[in-house]
């Protein structure tokens, strides 16, 4: 029972009038012929010249709703119309599994496509992008709009064609990588995107929250010694893992210090790792260095922390799998392998050294962006998900989107049972198998959701021994994914799925399954996120179907082990509970949710911190990409070149002062290698307007160069083209180096906190200084190369 109205209740009340308008138009639109209904698209486009999208919304939604009915045989319900309106307002619509989010998408996609600027519908994998574009594309094209789809294997020319469509279905990864590639193009025709206008993000929490900690990176290889990674790994395995003593508030206020044991502390709660004083001393001894924190030893410190992190915090068959002499990353939120994705900064090499597989060359980052900064580039964005309210603060703070819960079309009748808590994992697994046997006997379909591949394989083996036929869906067999999910709701089906939460396909029940009680969902442990658990529960009870959900957890599970398993152990002991027997109480479930909330807060803080650092990089990236685009668009940059010449002269004159006078020798050494002017004498520097005369002389010299090129290549505007080409190449060369330098700065910036400085402020200040130095280098290299340009003389 609710005593108070929620934010969602208030917002839904506001849009009920619009929903009513749309429903009242239904009889009128139902009487239109197919041709009359199709002609509405062109009518709306013309009206947009005088009216806003908001003015058109009721009629446009009524039109596409009628088209959905005629083409697909599906008409959006009033609650689905609500979801469509919320999304058109640039918000997140939280809609339960099975409530037809794919159909809802047609409403805001159609409306926003009328502008002609393009709509991107973002999905989490190629399969869903292709499936949804094939199905929903029928409606858009029937209404006179074009619809396309971009998948991983598509070549650039085809991508350009698909981006030119009114509505384009694509994954978040492909969208981000195309943006980066476009900003590395050396010719305008190589660019495939046409701007970031409006996007609809399906599974928006997965894209904007779960994947926000992993930036998109385009990389090349850089030379490095493989032996150093093996050395780091060998030394890391020799160091002793310790524990930190947490302080209570009174100790902290009185100035007591926590004590650290061992050589390093790996905190799985916060996914942090740091060296103790003893560990620092051992590393200094191992590598025969004086001070590990000295700038020249930064690579050793970074390599050792990577090796320790690989050994202490990253787990095989959970964070990654080893296959065919290769370490492959696993998306921990979906259980899918991410082919082609590698950690940067030596982290992947640390894992390869740990697992004893071939060590591949380290990546050099050529271009990078976080999903947070990428999606914030859209003029307007919205999203839909089954579970968004637990992350509402993050959506609002980072993306400026609030989350509105849309009621279900039919009431949810699924039973969510209390958690069963066991002492050990072995007891828990035995209890799960026992429960599966019991439920399976009556034919009720069962879905067992696991956090790792390892657990899915343990349970699979146990079920086989009991003679229970089942399907296994994990990161090792993604090809069979859709087929397995399609069968999971059949009578008598048993399915084990690694992190089923992120699968994106509905489980539909047959009639016998409904009679048997619907889908029985078993969670094998609580996830770090309440949202992921809710996604697993939400697989059952779709569209008013019956169903059950229950979590089996143990005191050895990561979440309980890290957040207060001692408390539960004492409860077991005080109650005298025998081995193999569980505790079940709502209080325990609430305690687990409290622990999850703490982890979520830690992750939010981590993502927010990442964004604050990345914002510095983003400000720099914006400037570089804006200047590159000017060049690619064919804008005349001749005036920019002349400005660079003046800037270089001014800078070199300032650098050549000795006391109160300009040193002619220093100025010749500093300036003439860049701008080949006649040698400057001491007397010249004393003249009035000396700097002005240098500006004039340099430009006259440049004009002579231009005249020479014009004579050799008449009517070809050769010098303008050379200016563009050389500037682009120089910008790219130094920008890639800047990315690398900023990354090195980020790795070591925490050391400044020992000097009572704010790391984030120092990162911004030092990054700004490095960016200015990069700009100077770009100017000097570009101008130097332009003065060296000469026509090619061909023998007749």
What does each of the following model-derived ranges do?
Residues 1-576, 625-626, 643, 647:
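Conserved P-loop NTPase motor core
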């Amino acid at each position: 029972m609710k005593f108070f109205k929620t934010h969602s209740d208030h917002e839904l009340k506001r849009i009920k009038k619009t929903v009513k308008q749309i429903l009242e138009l239904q009889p009128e639109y139902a009487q239109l012929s197919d041709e009359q209904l199709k002609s509405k698209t062109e009518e709306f486009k013309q009206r947009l010249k005088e009216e806003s999208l908001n003015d058109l919304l009721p009629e446009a939604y009524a039109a596409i709703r009628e088209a959905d009915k005629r083409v697909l045989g599906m008409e959006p319900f009033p609650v689905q119309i609500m979801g469509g309106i919320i999304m058109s307002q640039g918000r997140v619509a939280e809609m339960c599994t099975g409530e037809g989010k794919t159909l809802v998408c047609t409403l805001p996609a159609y409306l926003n496509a009328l502008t002609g600027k393009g709509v991107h519908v973002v999905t989490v994998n190629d399969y869903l992008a292709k499936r949804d574009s094939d199905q929903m594309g029928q409606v858009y094209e029937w209404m006179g709009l074009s619809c396309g789809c971009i998948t991983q294997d598509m070549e650039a020319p085809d991508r350009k064609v698909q981006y030119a469509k009114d509505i384009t279905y694509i994954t978040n990864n492909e969208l981000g990588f195309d943006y980066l590639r476009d900003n590395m193009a050396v010719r305008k025709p190589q660019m495939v995107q046409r701007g970031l206008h409006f996007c609809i993000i399906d599974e928006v929490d997965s894209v904007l929250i779960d994947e926000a900690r992993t930036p998109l990176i385009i990389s090349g290889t850089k030379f490095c010694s493989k032996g150093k990674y093996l050395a780091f790994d060998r030394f890391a395995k020799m160091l002793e893992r310790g524990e930190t003593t947490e302080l209570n508030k009174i100790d902290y206020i009185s100035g007591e210090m926590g004590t650290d044991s061992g050589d390093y502390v790996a905190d799985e709660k916060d996914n942090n790792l740091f060296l103790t004083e003893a560990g620092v001393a051992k590393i200094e001894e191992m590598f025969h260095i004086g001070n590990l924190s000295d700038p020249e030893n930064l690579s050793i410190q970074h390599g050792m922390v990577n090796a320790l992190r690989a050994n202490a915090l990253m787990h095989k068959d959970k964070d990654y799998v080893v296959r065919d002499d290769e370490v492959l990353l696993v998306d921990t939120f979906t259980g899918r392998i991410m082919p082609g994705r590698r950690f940067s900064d030596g982290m992947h090499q640390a894992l390869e050294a740990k697992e004893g597989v071939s060590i591949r060359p380290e990546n050099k980052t050529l271009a990078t962006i976080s999903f947070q900064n990428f999606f914030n580039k859209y003029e307007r964005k919205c999203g839909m998900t089954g579970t968004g309210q637990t992350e509402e603060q993050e959506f609002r703070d980072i993306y400026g989107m609030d989350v509105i819960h849309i009621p279900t079309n039919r009431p949810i009748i699924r039973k969510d049972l209390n958690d069963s808590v066991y002492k050990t994992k072995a007891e828990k697994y035995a209890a799960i198998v026992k429960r599966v046997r019991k439920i399976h006997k009556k034919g009720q379909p069962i879905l067992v959701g696991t956090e790792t591949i390892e657990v899915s394989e343990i349970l699979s083996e146990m079920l086989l021994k009991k003679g229970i036929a089942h399907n296994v869906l994990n990161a090792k067999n993604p090809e069979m994914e859709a087929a397995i999910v399609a069968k999971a709701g059949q009578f008598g089906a048993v399915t084990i799925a690694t992190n089923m939460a992120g699968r994106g396909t509905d489980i539909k029940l047959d009639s016998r399954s409904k009679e048997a009680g619907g889908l029985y969902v078993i969670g094998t442990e609580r996830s770090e996120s309440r949202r992921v658990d809710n996604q697993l529960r939400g697989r059952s009870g779709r569209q008013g179907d019956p169903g059950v959900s229950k979590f089996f957890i143990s005191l050895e599970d990561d979440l309980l082990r890290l957040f207060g398993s001692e408390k539960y152990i004492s409860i077991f002991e005080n109650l005298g509970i025998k081995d193999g027997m569980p505790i079940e109480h709502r209080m325990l479930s609430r305690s687990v949710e409290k622990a999850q909330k703490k982890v979520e807060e830690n992750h939010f803080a981590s993502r927010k911190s990442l964004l604050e650092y990345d914002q510095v990089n983003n400000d720099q990236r914006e400037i570089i990409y804006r200047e590159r685009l000017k060049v690619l668009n064919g804008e005349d940059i001749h005036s920019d070149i002349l400005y660079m010449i003046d800037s270089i002269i001014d800078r070199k004159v300032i650098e050549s002062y000795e006391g109160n006078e300009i040193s002619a020798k220093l100025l010749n050494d500093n300036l003439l290698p860049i701008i080949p002017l006649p040698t400057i004498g001491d007397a010249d520097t004393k003249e009035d307007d000396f700097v002005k005369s240098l500006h004039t002389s340099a430009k006259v010299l440049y004009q002579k160069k231009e005249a020479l090129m014009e004579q050799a290549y008449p009517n070809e505007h050769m010098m303008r083209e050379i200016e563009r080409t050389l500037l682009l190449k120089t910008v790219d060369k130094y920008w890639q180096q800047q990315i690398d330098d900023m990354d090195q700065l980020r790795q070591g910036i925490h050391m400044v906190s020992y000097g009572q400085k704010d790391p984030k402020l120092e990162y911004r200040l030092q990054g700004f200084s490095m960016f200015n130095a990069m700009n100077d280098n770009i100017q000097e290299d570009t101008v130097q190369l332009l003065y060296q340009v000469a026509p090619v003389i061909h023998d007749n």
